[in-house]
Amino acid sequence: DGRGIDCALLVDEKFEVLNSDFIKINNPIESRATRDIVFGKLKFKNQIINVFVNHWPSRWGGQEASNHKRVFVAEVLRKYIDNNTSESDFNLIMGDFNDYPTNESLAEVLVKDDLVNLMSKSNVSGRGSYNYRGNWDWLDQIIVSQDDFKLISFGAFEEDFMMYTNKKGEVYPNRSFGGNNWYAGFSDHLPVFLRFTF
């Protein structure tokens, strides 16, 4: 986007890159384009892994007023998955969705019986990836295929050096900028992670 906050996928050389693409999000009722979804088709041993890196439209103007933007992106991604992946593939969908796991775009549009949102599981590690007015929740999520794989760990990565405490005693991820002010942090979101084996 205009701030240079774009999506990328870094791939270890142990993986073979079979294909890559930028999934365009062209919403006809929006004057401003939103970020592409980065797609990578990888091969590890005999397993095909489809990776989708997302940063969906913000909640600027309010969750309800902006909801249709994220629902549209979810519909585009769902259609891409249905048309371009096979049942034997392992799909790995990650990013900042600017919606929570229970919101329409994720719970009703994207995540069907073939997928599971790991941030909805009771054994997720951490209290959330984002703190909004003192309330932690998951804007940043990892969604995977309902396949035969072994989960090792997943959740939000949080260390003391990444955080700050405000005057109310509330703990937040330390952002880089707040308006024109430089706070020397890395992000107002915590990174999410997943470790698994097939």
Regions found by a protein language model. Name each.
Residues 26-29, 58-61, 160-162:
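A short local loop/turn or secondary-structure capping micro-motif enriched for an aromatic residue
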Residues 2, 29-32, 62-73, 97-98, ...:
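Extracytoplasmic/periplasmic, Sec-exported soluble proteins
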Residues 32, 83-91, 99-198:
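Metal-dependent phosphoester-hydrolase catalytic domains
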Residues 1, 10-13, 22-23, 52-57, ...:
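Active-site-proximal beta-strand/loop segments in catalytic clefts of secreted hydrolases
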Residues 1-48, 52, 56:
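Structured beta-strand-rich core segments of catalytic domains in phosphoester-bond hydrolases
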Residues 38-123:
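Extracytoplasmic, non-cytosolic globular domains
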